[in-house]
Amino acid sequence: AYVLYTSGSTGRPKGVGVSHGALWTHLQDFLATFGIDGTDIVLHSSTINFDVALHETLPALLRGATVEMRGAQPWDLQSLSERLVKRRVTFARIPTALWQQWQRHAPPRAQLALRQVTVGGEALPGDALARWREGPLADIRLDNLYGPTETTVAALYRRTGADD
């Protein structure tokens, strides 16, 4: 299906091939887990050469959802919030570090259509999760994803809950 180049843990670049079957199985599981459908507006925030971009595009396209493309400029807190509000995004994957900053400056809940946020790329700190769970955005589902490129984007999904 695709080849991505990564240095992984070795620091030496290598091509990682992912088969059509592995990608298809992964996408079916992702869709079943997160329930993306034709009514969703999914935020695309990663560069296309990063495997996470597949989570931000392919599930939405398979279900007839809208993909809200990032554009050439990287996100800052204000532009991320403006895009989420203006485009009525319902599903967003936000890098963990950016999410931690964004939740402190997020727009009021009534302005957001978000139903699901996924974070990943680094550990999800417990204090940041507690702040989310105790704050005004607590009804937006938050899940942590992890996986090296070799495992077809993400190998583990952690659905966060009240006890986390």
Describe each region flagged by the PLM.
Residues 1-164:
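Motif- and composition-driven signal specific to adenylation
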